[in-house]
Amino acid sequence: KEARVGIERRQIEEDTSKNIHTDSESLLNFNRASIPLIEIISKPEIKNQEEAYAYLTTLRERLKYTKISDVSMELGSLRCDANVSVRVKGDTELGTRTETKNLNSFKAVVRAIEYETARQIEIIENGGRIVQETRLWDEENGITRPMRSKEESMDYRYFPEPDLPRVHISENRLAAVEKEMPEFSEDKVVRFIAEYKIPEYDAGILSGEIELAAYYEKVTKTSGDAKLSSNWVLTEVLRILKEKNISIEEFSVSPE
């Protein structure tokens, strides 16, 4: 099943710090202070946690394949907040939303959305009212906790930076950029199946990371046996990468 999710806007910001929350305290990590970042605001068109996961993995792939970012949540180069709202079946307007932070993995995003959806449904079914607020994901207990109420929070009054000129992108420039786009994973899967005659499952794993896909193709070119190369990469190579906790770029065996 395919789903289409629009992007409301992208905005350039400057990183300030990273919040790290524990049961007893909240810490601030300033290691990334002043580093530029891009915030991508998605339209409220994601219907459930499964669609959210699919959207995030696709977005992460696009950002990595185009070398915009290494998109590592562990290193702080990718972060995600989840806005959740529910509505009674038949209603046309979205319900009051909450924003959940402290999500350190895509699996945490899925669990947080699932929990927050169930929490809001229970409140409404019991005659209660959803409060617009920011909540924190408690990974250990699998719940969200209130952080601050947005109904009482300061109005930051966002406005465009007047000292930065507007950038106008022409249709010709857009067309040129589209031609420079790399081959994304879904296209690689189709090509790997057709060209190398490997199963769809194998093609999906091999094309999941651009560096792994490139490594596999070099091994195949060297060995002359696409299936044997696929089996070796998927078993021996990935096993060693997992055991040593390294990336394919750090792997000591040359594909040639």
Regions found by a protein language model. Give the residues of each.
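SsDNA-processing nucleotidyl-transfer enzymes
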Residues: 1-33
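Charged, compositionally biased, marginally structured helical/coil segments
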Residues: 22, 28-45, 50-256
